Amino acid sequence: PEKDPNFVKFGFYNDLRKILTSKMFYPVFITGLSGNGKTYGSQQLCAHLKRECITVPITIETDESDLLGDKTLIDGNVVFSQGPVVDAMERGAVLILDEVDLASNKIMCLQSIIDGKGVYLKKDNRFVKPAPGFTVIATANTKGKGSDDGRFIGTNVMNEAFLERF
């Protein structure tokens, strides 16, 4: 992302900077009210550190094909077109899963990735191991428990096993 000269460091910035500077795999789950800068702050930190950052907006419709890739038709040939998660893994980039609490259980395909183990792409018959520097930041308005007060309609209760990986 492009560096914003007007960006002001706040909140989680210094802790996240230590994690991203180390280039170790350390998945981070950032929660907070809308408009608090969870995603933008993470993107600006990547810009400051000159780290490649791939942001994936998550919705209720997001599935394995959107994240990992799918077969597609190009010039009459069926080829595998890899998704943004695989791109980030192979390039050692920072992957931001934006608004992850809007997702359905279809994002469970990310469990082995969030464990730092890589992923088998069954549609491409290959295993992808994360390159050095790859890590995951997930942002959410809730703590994965849904929204009881109705402020964040559309958020979901997330799988506990998924949440424990952060």
Indicate residue ranges for each PLM-predicted region.
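AAA+ P-loop NTPase catalytic core and its hallmark functional loops
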Residues: 1-166
